[in-house]
């Protein structure tokens, strides 16, 4: 507070300052406030020693400051702080703008969004593992699509459907339909696919007016419950007029009823507000990552609902469904299927959503469907069962999905099927099955009037046109297809007609049951058709035998449609049909079984059961069934036969019965034929290969056996015949069945039929392959016959046979695929082969490796028929076989042996298809050891490809040419996968054949023994003959291989055969692997059992099978130690590592040596060095050596780059240069003991070297790129090292990784490094090193992994480098000691299994390396 005295003093000070002495004196004297100063005032008027300032400031200063302040107040000067803040803001904004404009940022953002979405989808996949198989099927069908784009859609669609098996089915149908118009499907499917099914549904609606949109979502939910066409209701035009009317009525109701609209909007808004913003942005980014702003605006403006999360859509649907106000609306769409619909809406909503994905294309698809129907009608006396079958299939699928109201559903499905059936029967077998037809038809008409309309419409020219197109491209003659269908159908239907009256209520039921969970139940029922129902019982009431028969009949009808469909729209139709038709064939088989109430009859149900059991998600299984109809084409059966030669032998009758619903006359004798329908020999044996003759009969019948891949051991057991079916664990069996729509050929060629009958894949999700061209159809049929495994072509799209290898292999697994892969089946990848493959008739046939040729049920064999061969005739089919080892390492190992022996026992292996085998031999077989990383050149997916042999038939003739280069992988688990990579093998098929004969045979032998070991390992319990011998060795190898390599060796045919061996994710499949392995092993066991003899000669000569067995046993003993090592080495990827080491060690040491030396020097090097860059490695390895030299060069270059980047020659084995690794491997492999050590070292090199490298070089970032996809997904080097191929398969199988072209192998690695940053990479490397060191310690101490983990955690703080160096040394020493220990130790397979189990606990199957490391809680 300023006092007057202060002011006076300030004034006084001013006066003094101005030297106004007189004024000062006067002021002092006169001022009442300055009296004290007056007393001391001097004469001059100055106050001595007095401060006349205020706070040290005199009046002038104060005034000046005040003036300045006032001036500032009046001025607009911006504070410096504000200006700096503005500058910062401006800079930030400019940065944001530049980032948006920069492609790198957009790509990064896109990648992050995609990765996030992929991760979410992958998690969903994992969560929905119950229905993953079916989703796999979905993916496969998509892939089956005739256009490359379709696979993309399929992949995405698969993701959304992954969680829901039923939706997947629906999606498949939709995809198939849309596939004809691949462009539309891609466009709509791709962007929509990203959105979960419900969202997709929304997409459709979003395109419509707001009122319509609302009604559409409701309609979709309604339609989803209804048949597929109903679901595709966005394009009501495509559906029957009645359906259109229903939709129109529903629309009018919604539009005219404002309360409904309000409620709909209310329901949507409830969830939209919370979900749309979040879901829309990522979705938008996903669809239009480059232009997020516009895309956001567009998406928000036009189809905001599209971007609603699946959950939100689902919630809205549920809300709407639960709202009684909408009951009338739903009733409109029910068409007597209300019960089913009610059950299905939730389930089907997702499927519907998926369908929505393809909704826009669906109109066209529907049109195509109609065309198919019409065409089929033309071909099959104008029956539109095709479309109907689709719809029925949808309904059936929905029913299956809903899994409740089984009776009702079956009825509904029955009706649908009946309708189809009736159409087919009327046209094809009008007189044959009038009563049955009537029953089914009536039901169909009653409950499926929509379907009926759709069928009618299908008959319309529109359908015909589409069908014509599809048929033209896929089937030489629609009439032929129709004939083929008719033939098989007639047999089926005849048998049906005989039993259809009984079955009328069951057809759908059977179907459903197949889709549902036939697997073990069917086996139980295997005695009767009702067995089939039994399996389907969950879905439908267990029908009596007659019921089953009826079901069979309906299914058969559906089959007929599917077959026609398959022929016409093989890829889409086949896919779709595969889903449904698989079931139908299964049903048909039961029907045939019903006809033959003998073992055969019981067998088909087992087949179905197995297929379902295998699938149970068993949609795949159903697909297997579907192939049965295709089998009619013989191709299915042939594929089955091929797949199941061994099992067929074991279960010939079963196979035969499954196969031959065709000839009603063929009863028990032909029972095999009847069996064809599900070819209960779902197990490999299910194919009645053993019953070569019956199988042949079936084939001639146009066995529908196509299918029953993966009959559960029960089924086989049920089949008195199939002791070989080896007690395949039905639960562990996942069957993939490929249905080929080359019915005409199947029916026309008895040989093809027999081949088809011989095919049976235990663990094969059904894949429907359609011939791209008519000529191809015949060829394709043959191929399928030879390798119904082709049915395993889960996602492989059959394309140009020659180029198909590569194109086919363009598997484009997505996250969902990875999940699929996780599905015990290698099929999981449902590699979406770019339909580009459809050359002239080349088809990619995924043949269950479990089948004869490929001893692993998990494995999938993709066989393509070359068009040229097709030209020769239906029998003549050059087939490329791709073996996708689901996650069963056994597959690779066993088949090679079998294949090696297959030529001699071709009949056995490919009993029926032997006759066809010559044709197949024209085809080339590609064995892809590592499903994930290796990529066929033409393939988008990473499918290791190797030329198996000229023999197109995987199962048929001599495996002499089986290029098991990928099989070298057994030595290096990863290497194998990489070896098969070269798609170029096709070009060098001749070379490869020659090479294969010399080199390949050794590789094959190794692989064979390895495969056998693998198969045996997992299947040891089930197959004790060979399982015990091989099993012990295989046990070691199998677990280590985790099915990676098993598939490649599975096809040692001379003809140029390409077998794609897809290895299911090792890490993600870590847990699944157990079951997969088991399933695969069981299948393999069967194959081994069958092929052990076949392969023995070759193996003995090359590998000395007895020594192999001994080695296997030794290795089995040693394996535990290896496991310990690998576990210690990398607790996370120990499983893969273990698999790797076991593989490497397990295969005959010499064989491995020779394999690595001869074929896998680079491979090994790549494997060891570039296991990380799986894709690159894959490209280099198998094919790279011979035809994949370019690939090898590329891979080597990439590897070298990696090594340079890694700058980590830390491991001698891992010599920075591939050469170094190769040298080490060579040196180690040169000696028998060294071979084991070499295998282990290879193991260690890839396993430890990468991690060690990163640790030693402290260049984790480079190494991360080097590690490739493995590192990308599991940024931990140890993981990639652990099982590059295996994990590749697992991760890439389920992730887009597989889709990444071979060259992109490094890409994934780079992206993680760039995204994560070098620091993260270093930390990851440190984590990996710690894990590896712990693994090394564990190896040295042979202590359990858990203990090692604890030790490692405690000692993790110890110097990493020291540990890394020690680890490298230890790894080498351990690998050597482990090799010796392997020979000496007698750890049983169980131990190994236990360890494997432990490993998953340490490194969960679904967990990424990063997550796993994080879960370790290292305190570094």
UniProtKB/Swiss-Prot annotation:
Per UniProt, residues of the LisH domain are: 3-35
For biological process, the GO terms are: cell cycle G1/S phase transition; in utero embryonic development; positive regulation of transcription by RNA polymerase II
Which lineage do the record's taxonomy fields give for this organism? Answer: Eukaryota, Metazoa, Chordata, Craniata, Vertebrata
Annotated stretches, region: Mediates transcriptional activation: 263-339
Q: What is its main location?
A: nucleus
State the UniProt keywords alphabetically. Acetylation, Activator, Cell cycle, Isopeptide bond, Nucleus, Phosphoprotein, Transcription, Transcription regulation, Ubl conjugation
Q: How is it modified after translation?
A: Phosphorylated at Ser-771, Ser-773, Ser-1096, Thr-1264 and Thr-1343 by CCNE1/CDK2 at G1-S transition and until prophase, which promotes association with histone gene clusters and stimulates activation of histone transcription. Also phosphorylated by CCNA1/CDK2 in vitro.
Name used for this protein in its record: Protein NPAT
**Segment Disordered: which positions?**
179-236, 534-612, 625-670, 696-727, 1089-1190, 1202-1234, 1249-1297, 1348-1400
């Amino acid at each position: 507070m300023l006092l007057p005295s202060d002011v006076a003093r300030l004034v006084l000070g001013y006066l003094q300052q101005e030297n106004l002495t007189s004024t000062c004196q006067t002021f002092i004297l006169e001022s009442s406030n300055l009296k004290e100063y007056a007393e001391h005032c001097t004469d001059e008027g100055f106050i001595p020693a007095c401060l006349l300032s205020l706070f040290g400031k005199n009046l002038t200063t104060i005034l000046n400051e005040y003036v300045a302040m006032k001036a500032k107040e009046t001025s607009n000067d911006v504070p410096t702080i504000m200006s700096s803040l503005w500058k910062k803001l401006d800079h930030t904004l400019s940065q944001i703008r530049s980032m948006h404009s920069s492609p790198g940022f957009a790509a990064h953002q896109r990648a992050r969004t995609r990765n996030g979405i992929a991760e979410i989808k992958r998690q969903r996949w994992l969560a929905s593992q119950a229905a993953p198989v079916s989703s796999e099927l979905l993916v496969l069908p998509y892939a089956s699509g005739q256009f490359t784009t379709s696979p993309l859609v399929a992949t995405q669609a698969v993701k959304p459907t992954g969680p829901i098996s039923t939706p997947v089915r629906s999606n498949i149908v939709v995809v198939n339909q849309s596939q004809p118009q691949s462009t539309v499907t891609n466009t709509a499917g791709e962007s929509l696919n990203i959105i979960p099914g419900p969202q997709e549904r929304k997409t459709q609606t979003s395109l419509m007016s707001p009122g319509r949109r609302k009604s559409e979502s409701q309609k979709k939910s309604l339609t989803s419950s209804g048949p597929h066409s109903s679901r595709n209701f966005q394009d009501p035009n495509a559906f029957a007029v009645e359906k259109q009317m229903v939709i129109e009525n529903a629309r009018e109701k919604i539009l005219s009823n404002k309360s409904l609209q309000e409620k709909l909007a209310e329901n949507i808004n409830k969830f939209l507000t919370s979900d749309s913003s979040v879901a829309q942005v990522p979705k938008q980014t996903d669809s239009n990552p480059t232009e997020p702003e516009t895309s956001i605006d567009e998406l928000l403006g036009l189809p905001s609902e599209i971007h609603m999360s699946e959950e939100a859509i689902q919630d809205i649907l549920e809300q709407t469904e639960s709202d009684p106000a909408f009951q009338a609306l739903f009733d409109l769409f029910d068409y007597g299927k209300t019960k089913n619909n009610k059950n299905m809406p939730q389930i089907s909503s997702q499927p519907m959503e998926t369908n929505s994905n393809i909704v826009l294309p669906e109109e066209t698809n529907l049109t195509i469907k109609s065309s198919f129907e019409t065409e089929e009608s033309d071909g099959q006396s104008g029956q539109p069962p095709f479309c109907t079958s689709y719809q029925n299939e949808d309904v059936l699928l929905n029913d299956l999905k809903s899994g409740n109201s089984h009776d009702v559903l079956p009825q509904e499905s029955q009706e649908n099927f009946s309708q189809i059936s009736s159409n087919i029967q009327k046209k094809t077998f009008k007189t044959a099955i009038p009563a049955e037809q009537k029953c089914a038809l009536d039901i169909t008409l009653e409950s499926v009037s929509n379907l009926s309309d759709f069928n009618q419409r299908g008959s319309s020219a529109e359908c015909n046109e589409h069908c014509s197109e599809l048929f033209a491209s896929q089937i030489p003659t629609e009439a032929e297809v129709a004939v083929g269908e008719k033939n098989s159908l007639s047999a089926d239907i005849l048998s049906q007609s005989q039993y259809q009256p009984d079955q009328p209520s069951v057809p759908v039921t059977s179907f459903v049951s197949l889709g549902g969970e036939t697997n073990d139940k069917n086996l139980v029922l295997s005695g009767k058709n009702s067995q089939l129902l039994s399996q389907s019982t969950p879905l439908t009431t267990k029908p009596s035998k007659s019921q089953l028969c009826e079901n069979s009949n309906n299914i058969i009808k559906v089959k007929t449609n599917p077959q026609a469909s398959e022929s016409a729209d093989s890829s889409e139709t086949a896919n779709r049909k595969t889903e449904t038709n698989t079931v139908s064939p299964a049903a048909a088989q039961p029907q045939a079984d019903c006809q033959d109430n003998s073992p055969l009859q019981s067998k088909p149900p087992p087949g179905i059961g197995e297929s379902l059991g295998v699938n149970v998600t068993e949609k795949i299984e159903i697909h297997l069934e579907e192939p049965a109809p295709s089998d009619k084409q013989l191709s299915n059966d042939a594929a089955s036969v091929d797949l199941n030669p061994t099992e067929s032998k074991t279960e010939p009758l079963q196979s035969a019965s499954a196969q031959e619903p065709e000839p009603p006359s063929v009863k028990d004798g032909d029972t095999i034929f009847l069996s064809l329908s599900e070819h209960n020999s779902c197990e490999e044996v299910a194919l009645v290969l053993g019953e070569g003759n019956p199988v042949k009969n079936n084939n001639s019948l146009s066995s529908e056996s196509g299918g029953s891949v993966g009959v559960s051991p029960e089924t086989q057991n049920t089949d008195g015949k199939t002791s070989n079916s080896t007690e395949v664990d039905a639960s562990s069996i996942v069957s993939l069945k490929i249905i080929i729509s080359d019915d005409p050929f199947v029916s026309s060629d008895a040989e093809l039929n027999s081949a088809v009958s011989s095919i049976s894949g235990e663990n094969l999700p059904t894949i429907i392959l359609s011939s791209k061209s008519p000529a191809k159809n015949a060829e394709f049929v043959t191929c399928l016959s030879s390798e119904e495994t082709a049915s395993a072509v889960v996602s492989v799209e059959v394309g140009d046979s020659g180029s198909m290898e590569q194109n086919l292999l363009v598997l484009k697994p997505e996250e969902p695929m990875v999940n699929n892969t996780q599905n015990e089946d290698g099929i999981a990848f449902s590699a979406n082969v770019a339909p580009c493959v459809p050359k002239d008739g080349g088809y990619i046939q995924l043949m269950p490796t479990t089948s004869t040729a490929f001893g692993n049920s998990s494995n999938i064999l993709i066989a393509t028929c070359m068009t040229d061969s097709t030209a020769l005739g239906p029998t003549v089919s050059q087939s490329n076989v791709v073996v996708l080892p689901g996650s069963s390492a056994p597959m690779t190992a066993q088949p090679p042996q079998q294949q090696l022996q297959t030529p001699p026992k071709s009949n056995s292996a490919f009993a029926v298809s032997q006759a066809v085998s010559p044709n197949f031999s024209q085809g080339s077989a590609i064995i892809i050891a590592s499903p994930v990383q290796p990529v066929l050149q033409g393939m988008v997916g990473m499918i290791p490809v190797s030329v198996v042999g000229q023999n197109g038939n995987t199962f048929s003739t001599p495996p002499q040419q089986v290029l098991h280069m990928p099989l070298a992988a057994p030595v290096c688990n990863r290497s194998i996968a990489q070896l098969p990579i070269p798609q170029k093998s096709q070009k060098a098929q001749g070379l490869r054949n020659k090479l294969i004969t010399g080199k390949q045979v050794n590789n094959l032998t190794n692989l064979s023994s390895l495969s056998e070991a693998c198969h045996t390992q997992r299947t040891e319990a089930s197959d004790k003959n060979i399982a015990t011998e091989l099993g012990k060795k295989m046990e070691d190898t199998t677990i280590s291989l985790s099915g990676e390599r098993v598939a490649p060796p599975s096809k040692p045919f001379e003809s140029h055969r390409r077998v794609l061996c897809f290895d299911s994710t090792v890490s993600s499949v870590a847990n699944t692997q157990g079951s997969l392995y088991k399933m695969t092993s069981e299948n393999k066991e069967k194959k081994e059992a069958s092929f052990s003899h076949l392969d023995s000669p070759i193996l003995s000569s090359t590998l000395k099978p007895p020594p192999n067995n001994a080695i296997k046993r030794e290795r089995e003993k040693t394996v535990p130690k290896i496991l310990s090592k690998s576990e210690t080495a990398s607790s996370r990827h120990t499983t893969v590592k273990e698999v790797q080491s076991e593989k490497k060690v397990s295969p005959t040491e010499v064989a491995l040596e020779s394999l690595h030396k001869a074929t896998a020097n680079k491979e090994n090097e790549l494997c060891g060095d570039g296991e990380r860059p799986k894709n690159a490695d894959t490209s280099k390895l198998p094919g790279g050596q011979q035809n994949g030299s370019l690939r090898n060069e590329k891979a080597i270059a990439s590897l070298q780059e990696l090594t340079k980047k890694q700058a980590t020659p830390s491991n001698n084995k891992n010599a920075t240069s591939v050469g170094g690794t190769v040298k080490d491997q060579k040196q180690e492999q040169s000696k028998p003991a060294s071979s084991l050590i070499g295998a282990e070292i290879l193991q260690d090199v890839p396993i430890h070297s990468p991690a060690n490298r990163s640790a030693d070089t402290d260049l984790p970032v480079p190494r991360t790129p080097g590690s490739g996809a493995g590192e990308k997904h599991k940024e931990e080097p140890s993981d990639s090292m652990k099982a590059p191929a295996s994990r590749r398969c697992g991760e890439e199988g389920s992730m887009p990784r597989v889709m990444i072209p071979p060259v992109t192998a490094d890409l994934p690695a780079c992206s993680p490094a760039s995204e994560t940053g070098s620091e993260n990479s270093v930390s990851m490397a440190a984590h990996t090193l710690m894990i590896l060191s712990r693994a090394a310690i564990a190896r040295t101490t042979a202590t359990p992994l858990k203990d090692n983990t604890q030790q490692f955690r405690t000692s993790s703080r110890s110097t990493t480098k020291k540990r890394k160096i020690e680890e490298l040394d230890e790894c080498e020493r351990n690998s050597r000691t482990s090799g010796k220990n392997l020979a000496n130790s007698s750890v049983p397979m169980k131990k190994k299994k236990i360890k494997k189990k432990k490993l998953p606990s340490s490194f969960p199957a679904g967990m990424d390396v990063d997550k796993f490391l994080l879960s370790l809680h290292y305190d570094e």
